[in-house]
């Protein structure tokens, strides 16, 4: 039985992984063949999925075992990424709380919360909405009724 010796979290574009320095510098020293990983990742993330589409940033959790085998799980895009897409922003506020960069209606917040409910460890939609509102505030996005 092999034992997990490392766990790695990466943000990668769904369906667009290439064996470049960003991935190779993390996986290469641990003995993971980068081209094979990229091929498997692209195969998994290019399939139709309700939580993300090809090109979206997704969170990848890689478990590396002592026999140099690995497995990975893909979860949807981070909340901050989804909020920036909804608000059509390239970056969030450098000074949140004092500098607002966008306003989002509550309907957009609920949409993001529903999308992320699978990844969040919450029991109900209200808790997920509160978490997304907190992230929005920390990014300098004001939540308005609507």
Swiss-Prot record:
Gene Ontology MF terms in the entry: large ribosomal subunit rRNA binding; structural constituent of ribosome
InterPro entries per UniProt: Ribosomal_uL11 (IPR000911), Ribosomal_uL11_C (IPR020783), Ribosomal_uL11_C_sf (IPR036769), Ribosomal_uL11_CS (IPR020785), Ribosomal_uL11_N (IPR020784), Ribosomal_uL11_N_sf (IPR036796)
Alphabetized UniProt keyword annotations: Methylation, Ribonucleoprotein, Ribosomal protein, RNA-binding, rRNA-binding
Keyword Transferase: no
Biological process annotations from GO: translation
A Pfam family annotated for this UniProt entry: Ribosomal_L11
Post-translational modification: One or more lysine residues are methylated.
Superkingdom to which the source organism belongs: Bacteria
One cellular-component annotation, GO: large ribosomal subunit
Function: Forms part of the ribosomal stalk which helps the ribosome interact with GTP-bound translation factors.
Subunit structure: Part of the ribosomal stalk of the 50S ribosomal subunit. Interacts with L10 and the large rRNA to form the base of the stalk. L10 forms an elongated spine to which L12 dimers bind in a sequential fashion forming a multimeric L10(L12)X complex.
Protein family per UniProt: Belongs to the universal ribosomal protein uL11 family.
HAMAP family from the UniProt entry: Ribosomal_uL11
Protein name: Large ribosomal subunit protein uL11
Organism of this sequence: Wolbachia pipientis wMel
